[in-house]
């Protein structure tokens, strides 16, 4: 490390830093600070590989908006998606989200879930 050089270390106890969490906004792009990722456990890849669903094409949706029209719009767009989709859902919203997914996606869609607490 050179004198005056900026080094940022981001450690997450909730998966890979910068993937689907609030820490994504902390990344260093705006300040032109190089980022060197060190791969670790990732909920997206774990869910995809354990699901048994198609892995050749998938969409990572992440967390949906909490309320209102933007949430419904995003879910309606997802209802028309043919690829495997991965959503992050908070544990206390899990049952409500499954009901919502079932009502919008229909009974012909397979909804597979992993609950990570």
Put a short name on every predicted segment.
Residues 1-3, 77:
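Short amphipathic alpha-helix with an adjacent loop that forms part of the alpha/beta core around
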Residues 3-8, 84, 88-117:
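A contiguous loop/helix-start segment that scaffolds small-molecule binding in enzyme catalytic cores
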Residues 21, 25-81:
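Class I SAM-dependent methyltransferase SAM-binding "motif I" and its flanking Rossmann-like core
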